Amino acid sequence: MQIIDPQEVKSIQLAILADIDACCKAEGIRYSLAYGTLIGAVRHQGYIPWDDDIDLIMPRPDYDRFLRAFRSEENEVLDLSHSNVCVETFTKVCRKGTVMIDRALGRALWGVNVDIFPIDGAPEEGLEQHYEAMCRKQEWIPRLCPFYKAVGKNRFRWFVKYCLKRLRYPSLRRCAGVKQEINAELRACRFGDTPLAGAYFGDDGIREFMPAEWFLEYTELPFEGKMYPVIARYDDYLRRLFGDYMQLPPEAQRVSRHDYDSYLTDNA
């Protein structure tokens, strides 16, 4: 395999983003740059200099339509809510013929990708209890995921223990089954029917939930030389999540949060 340098990884991500954007424009699907990608668009008109990924959000109805509509010769949709070997529940659009190797786990993950998070409805009354109930269900996922705690030589031992547990307890739910239960409950709290909305399993906990109307209107901002959709209330959204996001973090914190290497596979 041939390693891909960080700048080329970004070029691939931007090509994936352009592919997603073309599909969404053709199908009338709403989406927005999100999280650090949105900060980058506002503050740098592109990537945050030390960032190395692209995050998007979509209202759940648009997210479901996108999963059905997206077709590409170069890229493929990976809906992680159907996976039994990872804890994530969102979607990645991955470049075919590439692979990312997690340095800590020492194993392949998926191809160079763009992340897409669904935005679901949330009740105003009892929000914290509702959110905590979803989190308790999510806590089951790593327990059922055979490689989640497996690092280095422990991977084989962990996998054997997992298989023996499955044989001894055949009724044990699989990781993807729990994810599907969670998604069914989230879809029941329909986007557009509730006063609040947010990404249940984003990184920012209860701060992820904000007025649903913030996800209804869109504008555009430049990102690496092209215009892309962003929610019109992007300033309110970013201040809710990050506070004064226009202030640069201390220099020691200006580092990537990810620990992987990307490669072209032999069949690329």
Question: Model-predicted segments: where are they?
Answer:
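Conserved catalytic core of two-metal-ion nucleotidyltransferases
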Residues: 1-25, 70-124, 142-153, 157-243, ...
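Active-site nucleotide-donor binding segment shared across nucleotidyl transfer reactions
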Residues: 21-54, 58, 63, 213, ...
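Amphipathic alpha-helical segments
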Residues: 61-62, 66-73
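A short secondary-structure junction signal
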Residues: 126-131
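Hydrophobic, well-structured mid-protein blocks that either form specific transmembrane helices
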Residues: 132-137
